Amino acid sequence: MRITQGTFSFLPDLTAAQVKAQIQYALDQNWAVSVEYTDDPHPRNTYWEMWGLPMFDLRDAAGVYGEVEACRTAHPGKYVRVNAFDSNRGWETVRLSFIVQRPEKEDGFRLDRTEGPGRTQRYALQHRSYAAG
């Protein structure tokens, strides 16, 4: 099952040219770009591992893309994403985030609902391997 997180998550994977174009767009907006990776894409896992430091002073998409490729090479079976942070007063948040690499086999999640005392509903997310069936 394909994990859907971030911008473009319902589209096919971006090509190298499309990734570079999105990075250039972020740089043109004066957003700081960073690269992160993880093996746990659970929705509550918002803190992925950073690849190096955010590139505050870099203005060239090719330089950022080089870091994306280095992260992909170092972590071939993990998720890799690009974030663009807007530090302008009033925003100060991630304005663009998209996954640029996925493992060959993506695990998914299942929502379990159980009824408790007084008809209360309890929900739990379960990690699930879809390759097992």
UniProtKB/Swiss-Prot annotation:
SMART domains: RuBisCO_small (SM00961). GO terms for biological process: reductive pentose-phosphate cycle. The keyword Oxidoreductase does not apply. Keywords: Calvin cycle, Carbon dioxide fixation. SUPFAM superfamilies: RuBisCO, small subunit. GO terms for molecular function: ribulose-bisphosphate carboxylase activity. It comes from the Bacteria. Heterohexadecamer of 8 large and 8 small subunits. RuBisCO catalyzes two reactions: the carboxylation of D-ribulose 1,5-bisphosphate, the primary event in carbon dioxide fixation, as well as the oxidative fragmentation of the pentose substrate. Both reactions occur simultaneously and in competition at the same active site. Although the small subunit is not catalytic it is essential for maximal activity. The basic functional RuBisCO is composed of a large chain homodimer in a 'head-to-tail' conformation. In form I RuBisCO this homodimer is arranged in a barrel-like tetramer with the small subunits forming a tetrameric 'cap' on each end of the 'barrel'. Belongs to the RuBisCO small chain family. This is Ribulose bisphosphate carboxylase small subunit. It comes from Xanthobacter flavus. The gene is cbbS.
